[in-house]
Regions:
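Conserved Rossmann-fold SDR core element
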Residues: 34, 165-168, 172-194, 221, ...
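Catalytic loop of short-chain dehydrogenase/reductase
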Residues: 13-23, 93-132, 136-177, 189-192, ...
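Canonical Rossmann dinucleotide-binding motif of NAD(H)/NADP(H)-dependent dehydrogenases/reductases
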Residues: 2-37
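The beta1-alpha1 cofactor-binding region of Rossmann-like NAD(H)/NADP(H)-dependent oxidoreductases
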Residues: 45, 63-74, 222
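A glycine/serine/threonine-rich, flexible loop-to-helix segment
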Residues: 49, 177, 189-213, 253-255
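C-terminal helical subdomain
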Residues: 121, 184, 203-239, 244-248
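A short hydrophobic alpha-helix cap/turn motif
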Residues: 29, 83, 134-135, 173-178, ...
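Rossmann-fold cofactor-recognition segment
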Residues: 51-69
Length: 255
């Protein structure tokens, strides 16, 4: 018996089997959940291929979070096929090249707008898809990178993560009376496809392991997946609006 027996989860942005979302989907299935994946654009074919590597191959739905039509179609599919949803994982993030790198001032508003819409506002989009299908409550979990500090080269993605954190708190406040919990998991740096596209990502890795009290393995997504699965379970019923650090303790220490 698993801690997610009978639960139905929407998992976004599984690109490869190195994705954090893949690790969450796999562990969720192992703990008894039924999952459906979403992908978008050129990444949709990657999601479909990667879905075959899960213990049970799930359905893959197209969801560009900037498209209200696709969001409505996903909601309609979930309602028709499942009738209810118990949880959703937000693992979505994107920034144009100008929003990353050494020059924070290089990005114009059009680039920043895309970054904020895809990486932060999309949490509200996912909540709008699943909340009506959670009559008995549920759990929305987002993947985050701690935005309290300014990181090398992270630039406007860091700003978007700060917006994501604020959005999660307001969603927690608004959806709490309906029994829906909203939390984020602030992960340490993990070598995913998305992470490798960030200029200066190696600087995060190099600093993390030696400073984290519990150490940190950037090749191991399991601690992050376990935290997400715990938040999807019924074991944390009073936890919402939380930013759960899964980073080996790096966030808690100084120099």
């Amino acid at each position: 018996m698993g801690i997610l027996d009978g639960k139905r989860l929407l998992i976004t942005c599984v690109l490869t089997d190195a994705s954090l979302a893949f690790a969450v989907a796999r562990l969720a299935q192992e703990e008894g959940a039924e999952v459906v994946l979403t992908g978008a654009g050129r990444g949709l074919s990657l999601t479909r291929r990667t879905a075959r590597k899960l213990p049970t191959e799930p359905e893959v739905l197209e969801l560009d979070v900037t498209s209200s039509e696709q969001a409505e179609a996903v909601q309609a599919w979930l309602e028709e096929r499942w009738g209810r949803v118990d949880g959703a994982l937000h693992a979505i993030g994107f920034a144009p090249e100008a929003c990353l790198g050494e020059d924070f001032m290089a990005a114009d508003w059009d680039d920043v707008r895309v970054t904020l819409e895809v990486s932060a506002y999309s949490l509200k989009t996912i909540a709008a898809v699943v909340a009506p299908l959670m009559p008995d409550g549920g759990s929305i979990v987002g993947l985050d990178f701690d935005a309290r500090l300014a990181w090398p080269a992270y630039n406007w993605m860091g700003v978007a993560k700060a917006a994501l954190e604020s959005t999660s708190r307001y969603l927690a406040r608004g959806l709490g009376p309906k029994g829906i919990r909203v939390n984020l998991v602030a992960a340490g740096p993990v070598r995913t496809m998305a992470a490798k596209s960030i200029p200066g990502f190696a600087a995060f890795e190099d600093a993390w392991g030696p400073r984290a009290p519990r150490g940190w393995d950037g090749d191991d997504p399991e601690p992050v997946a376990k935290a997400c699965v715990a938040l999807f379970s019924d074991w944390l019923p009073a936890t919402t609006g939380e930013l759960l650090h899964v980073d080996g303790g790096y966030h808690a220490v100084g120099a």
